[in-house]
């Protein structure tokens, strides 16, 4: 039975508050993704406003 057993080892390191992606901590990656998402959303809002104005001008 000992050959079929599975051991799970959980190691906690309190020095690193965030998991790391390569050399950058996850907090930097989260800020990068948040910045890109913000830029995308702002661009989407601007394009929506422009298209609504063009559509309104075309219909009126």
Curated annotation (Swiss-Prot):
The record, for Pfam families, names:
UL2
Please state where this protein is localized: Host membrane
Q: Which residues cross the membrane?
A: 33-55
- Its gene name is UL2
The name on file for this protein is: Uncharacterized protein UL2
- Keywords of the record: Host membrane, Membrane, Transmembrane, Transmembrane helix
Bilayer topology annotation: Single-pass membrane protein
List the InterPro entries hit by this protein, alphabetically: Herpes_UL2
Species of the source: Human cytomegalovirus (strain AD169)
Q: Which family does it belong to?
A: Belongs to the HHV-5 UL2 protein family.
What cellular component terms from Gene Ontology apply here?
host cell membrane; membrane
């Amino acid at each position: 039975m000992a050959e079929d057993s599975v051991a799970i080892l959980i190691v906690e390191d309190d020095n690193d508050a965030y998991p790391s992606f390569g050399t950058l901590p996850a907090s930097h990656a989260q800020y990068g993704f948040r910045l890109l998402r913000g830029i995308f959303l702002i661009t989407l809002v601007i394009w929506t406003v422009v298209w609504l104005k063009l559509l309104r001008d075309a219909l009126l």
